Amino acid sequence: STRRSFIKTAALGSVAVALPAFSGFDQLEAAAFNKAIDENNMTDVEKLHIPKVTLPPVVEDGNQAPIIVESDHPMEEDHYIKSIQIMNFNDPVVIKGQCFFTPKSGQAYVSTQIRLAGGESRVWVVCDCNVHGKWAISKDVKVAAGGC
């Protein structure tokens, strides 16, 4: 299982490097993760695994886009969120941040500022559960000025 996860992640990373400007890349990326069928009416499992993301729809300064990611998932020894990853496939640097957690972390929570290229893009946030795999949500954002 760990080997398969590594191979899947490595292959996805290779595609991310090779095709960052591909217009259908968001659809390709979305297929690699579990997502909510209906974000406005999530199941209990989806509510536990899909992160809550606070990101303004319009950011004035692309060099300092505030983002908060949190999860209500329990952090138990045998079932917890291993990591949160923030990505934007429209930017030269795709991975905006990645944080790792253990059950001793207490909660999977990230509050930071990320750099975004100017214009419109989609920010992906992925929570990786040690039992149920990777769960993703995306937020559209428009950068009014600046950017990386």
Spans of features found by a protein language model:
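N-terminal secretory signal peptides and thylakoid transit peptides that target proteins
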Residues: 1-15
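Exposed aromatic-hydrophobic patches
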Residues: 109-115
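Extracellular Ig-like/FN3 beta-sandwich strand-entry sites
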Residues: 118-122
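Beta-strand signatures of extracellular beta-sandwich domains
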Residues: 83-87
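C-terminal segment of N-terminal export signals and the immediately downstream linker at the start
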Residues: 20-53
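Short acidic/polar inter-strand loop motif in beta-rich domains
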Residues: 130-136
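Short edge beta-strand/loop segments characteristic of extracellular beta-sandwich folds
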Residues: 66-74
